């Protein structure tokens, strides 16, 4: 797997904020999480047409059996590519909390149990942090892209801290308890416009878009 370095990508991508002069690129986002799908659609430039799993007739549960974000993203992307023969990418995201030795990490989505209940996940996280002064945390998102038979990976991250209690009604997942560094409000309070500019997933999306620009793929 080729891992695209953020520094290399940003050096080129900063020359232009948009992917100008590119043909439409069709990609399947290998996720059953509709919140993620809509968030990524809002972030990626219009030159990238994002297909849902349903639009590729892949309606099966995606495998997620690895013990790393990178492994899970690769497993899901490979599964969808083999099923549909469609260029695609998958993601896995983890919240890593310093005082909990990196937990919940790869278990972020099902921290409190297999039902993937966001409210229960946040409640358990806040309980486990009771009495701990260090609330530093980071969100990491890893994208695995399979494009024309080649595999690439991109990583976005954002530092911050865990709030004392859940605040805000926006977003999804752990957004009500994650305060990005430099801010005093949670992602859920800040709203989608701010989150989609700052977040770990936004950074990974920018790297993905910049990959197509710098690689010359799709240029007219």
Residue spans of the language-model regions?
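Alpha-helical and His/Cys-centered functional microenvironments
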Residues: 7
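Cationic, low-complexity basic patches in intrinsically disordered or flexible, solvent-exposed regions
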Residues: 13-16
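Anionic-ligand binding patches
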Residues: 23-28, 34-220
């Amino acid at each position: 797997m080729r891992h695209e370095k953020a520094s290399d990508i940003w050096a080129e991508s900063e020359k232009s904020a948009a992917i100008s002069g590119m043909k439409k690129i069709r990609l399947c986002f290998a996720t059953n999480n509709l919140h993620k799908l809509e968030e990524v659609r809002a972030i990626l430039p219009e030159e990238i047409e994002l297909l849902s799993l349903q639009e590729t007739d892949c309606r099966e549960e995606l495998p997620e059996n690895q013990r790393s974000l990178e492994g899970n993203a690769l497993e899901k992307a490979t599964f969808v590519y083999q099923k549909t023969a469609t260029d695609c990418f998958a993601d896995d995201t983890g919240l890593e909390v310093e005082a909990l030795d990196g937990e919940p990490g790869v278990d972020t989505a099902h921290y409190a149990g297999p039902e993937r209940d966001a409210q229960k996940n946040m409640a358990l996280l806040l309980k486990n942090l009771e009495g701990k002064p260090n609330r530093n945390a980071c969100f990491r998102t890893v994208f695995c892209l399979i494009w024309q038979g080649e595999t690439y990976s991109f990583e976005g991250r954002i530092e911050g801290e865990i709030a004392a209690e859940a605040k805000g009604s926006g977003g999804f997942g752990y957004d009500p308890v994650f305060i990005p560094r430099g801010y005093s409000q949670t992602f859920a309070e800040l709203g989608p416009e701010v989150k989609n500019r700052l977040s770990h997933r936004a950074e990974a999306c920018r790297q993905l878009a910049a990959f197509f620009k710098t690689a010359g793929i799709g240029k007219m």
